[in-house]
Amino acid sequence: NGTCAWLRPDGKTQVTVEYQNDHGAMVPIRVHTILISTQHDETVTNDEIAADLKEHVIKPVVPENYLDEKTIFHLNPSGRFVIGGPHGDAGLTGRKIIIDTYGGWGAHGGGAFSGKDPTKVDRSGAYIVRQAAKSIVASGLARRCIVQVSYAIGVPEPLSVFVDTYGTGKIPDREILKIVKETFDFRPGMISINLDLKRGGNGRFLKTAAYGHFGREDPDFTWEVVKPLKWEKA
């Protein structure tokens, strides 16, 4: 947004977080390490880069209570980073499917999103299970959850739908699965309709090319909208 005029487009961030396993739910305790490598112009010093990154990037993003005197900061640890992008590297990777989703914390089926319209379950299937899992947690059915779905080409109904709450469910997983199947339609055509994925054409997905597909507050990210799930609380 122009706050750091020396910033350039290329870069990478990585945050290492320590968690505590609380009966299946993973609770963040502290940030162990923050790595930021960012391209910059020729006028700025490494000390200025480090100071700006702490003030304008880390401070607004990482809650203060997760940082302590033992938190390690690697800010442009390789030194000068003036030349970036395809000018600086040959053989760049394709779209990073793990960064697009859950950063290695959640499971991934292996299919990339980029270049695919909502008729491809690599994209739409990932979106509907995101909404389902998020709704399970938001409804108080579990503190942690994964929803898995599998398909065969040319077969509208999914081959399988699977729910695992890692022992955090308030009711058995099989009962949660029943609620999920009653609430969500996992057929690709119905996913597009129910999540309104064709609104605005495929250009709508340009926003997903950076900053990930999940955890975003944007009206176009319809899969982030929680659906209320009805269940009998003990």
Curated annotation (Swiss-Prot):
Binding sites annotated in the UniProt record for L-methionine: 89, 120
Reactions it catalyzes: L-methionine + ATP + H2O = S-adenosyl-L-methionine + phosphate + diphosphate
PROSITE patterns associated with the record: ADOMET_SYNTHASE_2
Source organism, top-level taxon: Eukaryota
Alphabetic keyword roster: ATP-binding, Cobalt, Cytoplasm, Magnesium, Metal-binding, Nucleotide-binding, One-carbon metabolism, Potassium, Transferase
Any GO BP annotation: one-carbon metabolic process
Induction notes from the record: By fungal elicitor.
Record EC number: 2.5.1.6
Cofactor note: Binds 2 divalent ions per subunit. The metal ions interact primarily with the substrate. Can utilize magnesium, manganese or cobalt (in vitro).
Tissues showing expression: Mainly in floral buds and roots.
Binding annotation for ATP: 10-12, 78-81, 89, 95-96, 112, 116, 120
Signal peptide as annotated in the record: none
GO cellular component: cytoplasm
Record's subcellular location: Cytoplasm
Cofactor(s) needed for function: Mn(2+); Mg(2+); Co(2+); K(+)
Broad enzyme group: transferase
Pathway: Amino-acid biosynthesis; S-adenosyl-L-methionine biosynthesis; S-adenosyl-L-methionine from L-methionine: step 1/1
Primary localization class, coarse: cytoplasm
Stored InterPro entries: ADOMET_SYNTHASE_CS, S-AdoMet_synt_C, S-AdoMet_synt_central, S-AdoMet_synthetase, S-AdoMet_synthetase_sfam
MF-aspect GO terms: ATP binding; metal ion binding; methionine adenosyltransferase activity
Main function: Catalyzes the formation of S-adenosylmethionine from methionine and ATP. The reaction comprises two steps that are both catalyzed by the same enzyme: formation of S-adenosylmethionine (AdoMet) and triphosphate, and subsequent hydrolysis of the triphosphate.
Family, similarity comment: Belongs to the AdoMet synthase family.
Protein name: S-adenosylmethionine synthase 1
Lineage: Eukaryota, Viridiplantae, Streptophyta, Embryophyta, Tracheophyta
The gene coding this protein: SMS-1
